[in-house]
């Protein structure tokens, strides 16, 4: 059963928070395709066996006619199921127009006080009809890649690694400050 997951988040962190739920969907339906607004999610999930494909939705705006543009994109995937981890009537309609048989999404008009983890967990459990969905994410990296990194890093001095990030100019400390 070809299944898609729509993650309407531009930041890598918000997308990775949802990875545990994507894995639950993949365990039920097989490897999934993730459609996202995050530029670098594809590279982060390159080694994940439960993720078939990551599609970066580059030019998507929030106008009414964009429903039809998005539906054309979704139609190309031939999904039988799509789970939309966001309360968007626009995305839901685009999926219906694309002819996707089973469209699941958050309740519409419930964006205020939307808790990223609790809402995703409850949505996953309800949609998949499971008792409990883990909230901790498993991150897959191939052994060959880890071995290559270990061989390239010298252990004769102390290392400090900073994992800073920012999704865009509206965040507390804009992304251009990290470049």
Q: Where are each of the predicted segments found?
A:
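Catalytic machinery of carbohydrate-active enzymes
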Residues: 1-179
